[in-house]
């Protein structure tokens, strides 16, 4: 994402000073030009490699898909698209907030960030709901868990997110500041109030609601799974796997999405209040630090691919055809085995021919005719 105070006037050395509301705060953001290029570079390499491998497994190794694998496939597609766009941001921040590319590319990079962010949230929500239904309504989930239903849900998710994030292409723009071109992640100054209202709606619709659903799923599953079936002790393996999956989803939310949305909301709110420069500097720094965490979900999502299903966990073993080990000559002699030679083959053929001749001579003609009629 671009600099947090993008609508403020920038100085040449990367600090920021007041806006139209009369603030005269200057923030030293030198740390950003090291933190963001390094973190985005790591996310780009790891995220792209892990998700490309995951896509290969989904497309080339899995023979049958269920609802979970369908959602994970679309999650990997979204993460791969985002990771592929990060080299442009790495260059942008390494150059000190200078965007030498076109405005269209600036809009596309910001659009991919928010699209990946909310696609990840919604697909993780779908995985959690699917697991929860498998625990609470195992019989009904047999029909709801088909891949064809998951494909329809995934299509709805893509359409919903693309439609909701389309305004980003309108708000995001570039501006010339001295000798540099800034690629804003919010909007121009005159549209900022509209952008804040739009972001608030997206916060509630695409983050608060899914996060609440995941929390409800986790609570319901925990209550059910803490009660073992009558006459049994412990939890079945399938139920333990469901709990691990949703617990991992909650960890991803807690680490990546929650800090980002909290600090961004505070940042947008504080910009319209007459607060001290110290307070604004603190929230500005927190907002910058949480942006790499929001991007890190592209690397953490593939962990789900290897923990959620048995086929994905065993993909490395299934990738090569199973072969039986060839016994050594000593082992063959111990077991009474030996490699057949030409003499053994001739003897075996003669024995089979002799047995066939004896069976033919002992079979009555009537029996042969009867067998043919049957």
UniProtKB/Swiss-Prot annotation:
GO terms of molecular function: A1 adenosine receptor binding; ATP binding; G protein-coupled purinergic nucleotide receptor activity; G protein-coupled UTP receptor activity
Superkingdom, natural source: Eukaryota
Alphabetic keyword roster: Cell membrane, Disulfide bond, G-protein coupled receptor, Glycoprotein, Membrane, Receptor, Transducer, Transmembrane, Transmembrane helix
Role noted for this protein: Receptor for ATP and UTP coupled to G-proteins that activate a phosphatidylinositol-calcium second messenger system. The affinity range is UTP = ATP > ATP-gamma-S >> 2-methylthio-ATP = ADP.
Entry protein name: P2Y purinoceptor 2
GN (gene name): P2ry2
Pfam families: 7tm_1
Region called Disordered, residue ranges: 318-374
UniProt topology in membrane: Multi-pass membrane protein
Subcellular location: Cell membrane
Chain ranges on the Extracellular side, renumbered to this chain: 1-32, 94-110, 173-194, 269-286
Glycosylation sites: 9, 13
Listed Basic and acidic residues bias regions: 341-361
